[in-house]
């Protein structure tokens, strides 16, 4: 098998499969003999821009608009309503099952992204992150770091919980100059 075919197969496998990282096996400091429970995190889907197998279409050149700020602001309240509606309708009666929740994160993120795009907010890039986990009296911290313009870029967040699972949805609206 040629190197090109191996690279293509590896990219397809990476794109379609799951990536599992064992957090406690990555780096262990010398002299640490304490027993720790292994932490496992799973990423079920990664879309890497620029590594698509299709033939790339030529870039479309657009003229400068010289518009520095958005004509329409990112509607945080409307996006919060979308997050609440989608998470409640999809997860209200669900019980936590790992494989089901893995599929639901993909579905919910696509639905939320489509509904936010239906608001037709010009010149904003939309990023949707969904976290679903089992509810077991644990705590969790989720953080994100971005370099952005606080005057134009913003986010919306909503958390949901029922008797067996929790979900957190974040939508980032980043102004595209």
Swiss-Prot record:
Classify the source by domain of life. Answer: Eukaryota
Entry similarity comment: Belongs to the dynein light chain Tctex-type family.
Which is an annotated GO molecular function term of this record? dynein intermediate chain binding
Q: Which GO terms describe its biological process?
A: microtubule-based movement
Please give the name of this protein. Answer: Dynein light chain Tctex-type 5-A
Query: Gene symbol?
Result: Dynlt5-a
- Quote the Pfam families the UniProt record gives: Tctex-1
Which Gene Ontology cellular component annotation is one that this UniProt entry carries? Answer: cytoplasmic dynein complex
The leader peptide range reads: none
